[in-house]
């Protein structure tokens, strides 16, 4: 088995799904619940297996334990997830992410997704407020820049892990090019845009930070994106960023691609180019775009 993947045994899967072990055995034997078997014949389950089961068999488990229960604290977190208590979860994830507790943050993200919360809701109601919270705490001098960076990178890593349990449509509905400007250092938001669009069925072209050597024209010639998503959080060089943005819009327009923008950086950038379809303010708007 892949040692980089988290596996649960039958007892742990039963606790998560809030059923007895005999139900787990029955469901695996009749093919309702997928699993992998070790050389010794033991059943092992991944979050993908449990997520697929919950999505396809909602009536079989009415109150799943969405956060693996190992302590009283775990029970509390599970209850907060079931109640969608985002105010509590923002505090919890903010604190855990600053301490680089990836496993704790990852479990909250997984739990919310297993509870059938849309990805854009998790991003709007939890991830974005946590990032803003820690940014504000740093500006106020209540945490160090290192702690703020710890939080951001922990969240980024956990978002990538979360994407691993999501079922992506095999049939593609278009191609989306996601990027940030050359002076932009914040790529978490555009990564969340990437994940939402992939969930919708788009083939994703993710370049991250634009560089001077990047031939934008070649990307359009080779991959033919029909949408471009650009995120900007902080603009340090307005003239350079404006020039880069205008160039992208010009090329996108020439190839018939629509441009979507988002982030506070666009308060400083003129985005009135005719290629721009809309400025997006939430991840729900990304999903609906």
What are these regions (language model features)?
Residues 1, 14-15, 99, 184, ...:
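Residue-level marker of alpha-helix boundaries and capping positions
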Residues 1-23:
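Polyanion-binding surface elements
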Residues 7, 20-21, 105, 190, ...:
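Generic non-transmembrane alpha-helix signal with a bias for helix starts/N-cap capping motifs
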Residues 10, 30-31:
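Extended non-core architectural segments that shape protein topology and connectivity
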Residues 16, 21-23, 32-167:
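Long amphipathic alpha-helical segments
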Residues 27:
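Residues in the recognition helix of alpha-helical DNA-binding motifs
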Residues 141-144, 150-289:
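C-terminal regulatory/effector modules of DNA-binding transcriptional regulators
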């Amino acid at each position: 088995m892949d040692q980089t993947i988290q596996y649960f045994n039958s007892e742990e899967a039963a606790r998560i799904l809030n059923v007895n072990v005999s139900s787990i055995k029955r469901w695996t034997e009749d093919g309702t619940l997928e699993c992998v078997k070790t050389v010794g014949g033991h059943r092992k389950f991944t979050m993908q297996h449990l997520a697929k089961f919950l999505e396809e068999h909602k009536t079989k488990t009415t109150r799943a334990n969405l956060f693996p229960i190992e302590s009283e604290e775990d029970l509390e977190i599970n209850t907060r997830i079931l109640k969608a208590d985002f105010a509590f979860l923002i505090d919890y994830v903010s604190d855990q992410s600053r301490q680089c507790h990836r496993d704790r943050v990852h479990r909250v993200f997984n739990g919310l997704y297993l509870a059938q919360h849309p990805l854009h809701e998790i991003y709007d109601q939890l991830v974005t407020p946590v990032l803003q919270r820690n940014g504000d705490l740093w500006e106020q001098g209540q945490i160090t820049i290192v702690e703020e960076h710890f939080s951001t990178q922990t969240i980024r890593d956990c978002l990538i892990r979360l994407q691993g349990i999501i079922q992506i449509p095999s049939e593609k509905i278009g191609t989306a090019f996601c990027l940030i400007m050359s002076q932009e250092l914040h790529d978490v938001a555009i990564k969340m845009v990437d994940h939402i669009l992939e969930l919708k069925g788009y083939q994703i072209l993710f370049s991250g930070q634009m560089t001077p050597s990047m031939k934008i024209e070649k990307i359009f010639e080779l991959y033919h994106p029909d949408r471009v998503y650009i995120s900007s959080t902080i603009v340090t060089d307005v003239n350079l960023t404006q020039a880069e943005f205008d160039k992208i819009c010009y090329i996108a327009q020439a190839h018939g691609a629509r441009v979507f923008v988002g982030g506070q950086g666009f308060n400083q950038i003129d985005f009135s180019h005719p290629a721009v379809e809309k400025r997006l303010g939430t991840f729900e708007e990304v999903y609906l775009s």
